[in-house]
Structure formats: structure tokens, C-alpha cells
UniProtKB/Swiss-Prot annotation:
This is Large ribosomal subunit protein uL10. The keyword rRNA-binding applies. GO terms for molecular function: large ribosomal subunit rRNA binding; structural constituent of ribosome. The keyword Ribosomal protein applies. One of its GO terms (cellular component) is large ribosomal subunit. Keywords: Ribonucleoprotein, Ribosomal protein, RNA-binding, rRNA-binding. Part of the ribosomal stalk of the 50S ribosomal subunit. The N-terminus interacts with L11 and the large rRNA to form the base of the stalk. The C-terminus forms an elongated spine to which L12 dimers bind in a sequential fashion forming a multimeric L10(L12)X complex. One of its GO terms (biological process) is translation. CDD domains: Ribosomal_L10. Belongs to the universal ribosomal protein uL10 family. InterPro entries: Ribosomal_uL10, Ribosomal_uL10-like_sf, Ribosomal_uL10_bac, Ribosomal_uL10_bac_type, Ribosomal_uL10_CS_bac.
Length: 166
């Protein structure tokens, strides 16, 4: 179905607005994926704060112009699904990576984070970023281990001091 110029401008504006507020973006090829599977993906995306849209390549290129995701323009070939993470930088990468495991025809093309292009083979770097709560927990564990280690070293020094005195 042909789109009117007004419709194209609306799509470009919508995707551009999503890109401006996003932390990261992932581009994928959704060719061969069933409608039911895409519906499941979109539902999961909404739950994770990820904006997902299938966009024509020329419209996608225009939408990302002047944003941090301009480096993705070379991946806009064939059917293009673009996902923007709004709440956590790794959310879209994690979502599409997990979706690709269950759908053999779904292929991640690449991602962008802070203006840097990340090829599909390195998508794990972005997908494995800890969430805010996970990062806080890791920091607390590190601090706890540091204080426990300091306590053990203090006890060992006290023991050594008593042995020398005896």
C-alpha cells in the first residue's frame, strides 16, 4: 500500500521523536516471522519500555538523521525493524536477542549506543549491561566484600601481633 506524503512525514516525525528520547537502538530483519510472533514481541517491548517499529529504509534514514543513531543508516537494507530502549540501554538488545533465539528467521543487524555502532556479533555487550537495580546490588556486594576483607585482615594482624607478644 502506497503511503501519502503526510503519512511518511508523520512516520519520520514519530520515529525521530522516539530516537531523540532513546538510550540505545537495535536494528533487525523480521522477514519470515509470523504475525503472532511479532505481536508477542511488541507486547514484550511495551512491558520493557522499548519502542518497536517496522519502518521503510528511506524513512528510517531520514528519521535518525541528526541523532546519536545516525551510524545505523548502513544497516537499513531489506525489511527493517528498529527498536529504541527508553528506560535501560540494554533493554532492546536483550529483548531482540532473546526473541531471535526462538525465531530462526529473525536476524539482528546491529545496534547503536552513545553514537557508536555495535555489530550484530557484539550485541551481547549491550544486552548484558546490568539494569540499575542489578548495578546497585553489584556495588553493594563489592562494598560489603571490601569491608569483610578489611575485617579479616584486621583480625589476622591482631592475631599476628598477639603471637609476637607471646
Amino acid at each position: 500500500m502506497a503511503l501519502r506524503l503526510e503519512d511518511k512525514k508523520a512516520i519520520v516525525a514519530e520515529v525521530n521523536e522516539a530516537a531523540k528520547g532513546a538510550l540505545s537502538a537495535v536494528v533487525a530483519d523480521s522477514r519470515g516471522v509470523t504475525v503472532g510472533a511479532m505481536t508477542v514481541l511488541r507486547k514484550a517491548a511495551r512491558a520493557n519500555g522499548v519502542y518497536v517499529r517496522v519502518v521503510r529504509n528511506t524513512l528510517a534514514k531520514r528519521a535518525v538523521e541528526g541523532t546519536a543513531f545516525e551510524c545505523l543508516a548502513e544497516t537499513f537494507t531489506g525489511p527493517t525493524l528498529i527498536a529504541f530502549s527508553n528506560e535501560h540501554p540494554g533493554a532492546a538488545a536483550r529483548l531482540l536477542k532473546d526473541f531471535a533465539k526462538g525465531n530462526a528467521k529473525f536476524e539482528v543487524k546491529g545496534a547503536a549506543f552513545e553514537g557508536m555502532f555495535i555489530p550484530a556479533v557484539d550485541i551481547d555487550r549491550l544486552a548484558k549491561l546490568p539494569t540499575y537495580d542489578e548495578a546497585l546490588a553489584q556495588l553493594m556486594m563489592t562494598m560489603k566484600e571490601a569491608s569483610a576483607g578489611k575485617f579479616v585482615r584486621t583480625l589476622a594482624a591482631l592475631r599476628d601481633q598477639k603471637q609476637e607478644a607471646a
